[in-house]
């Protein structure tokens, strides 16, 4: 999408990210979940948020389906529209992190290039990519929405894992084998990583 920012000026206020982090009592960062549909992204993301909330952290979960009800309601599922979806989400997450909030996202985000563009918006220590790795057969079996069946029948076009590709992350900070680890085990693994890396 073409930018039209020739006459714009980035305004900086009196309060910065560090001020907001002090107010919240912790660092802000993003936990970016990526993986096939029904691989466990949203379930684990909300468990992580629940545990961080118990610890007094200011958090927010951005979920792929929810975002498409509002911010990205004008987008379909073509390759270009999927790329624009992730671009918008990346910019939104950047604002949340600047506000001093821990942002947890749950998006298929199937293309490596798009994930790397989002990563480039942040300092290295502020971006934690979590890959929920799961065989497509297992995802299909646990699919409560019935979307895999529709995709296999051809009723849903450009469905990731069936009729559209998913490019696996090469070096995610965390890989969760969700056909082996339970959601609670996955949540604890992520919390240990956060504690060790960010001294939360």
Swiss-Prot record:
Gene3D superfamilies linked: P-loop containing nucleotide triphosphate hydrolases
**Under which pathway is this protein filed?**
Sulfur metabolism; hydrogen sulfide biosynthesis; sulfite from sulfate: step 2/3
Report the SUPFAM superfamilies cross-referenced here.
Answer: P-loop containing nucleoside triphosphate hydrolases
Any one GO molecular-function label of the UniProt entry: ATP binding
Q: What are the positions of the active site?
A: 109 (phosphoserine intermediate)
**Cited InterPro entries:** APS_kinase, P-loop_NTPase
Q: Which reaction does it catalyse?
A: adenosine 5'-phosphosulfate + ATP = 3'-phosphoadenylyl sulfate + ADP + H(+)
E.C. numbers: 2.7.1.25
> What are the binding positions for ATP in this chain?
35-42
The regions listed as transmembrane in this protein's record are none
Function noted in UniProt: Catalyzes the synthesis of activated sulfate.
Which family is this protein grouped under? Answer: Belongs to the APS kinase family.
Please give the HAMAP family that the UniProt record associates with this protein. Answer: Adenylyl_sulf_kinase
Q: What is this protein called?
A: Adenylyl-sulfate kinase
Organism of this sequence: Thermodesulfovibrio yellowstonii (strain ATCC 51303 / DSM 11347 / YP87)
Q: Which gene encodes it?
A: cysC
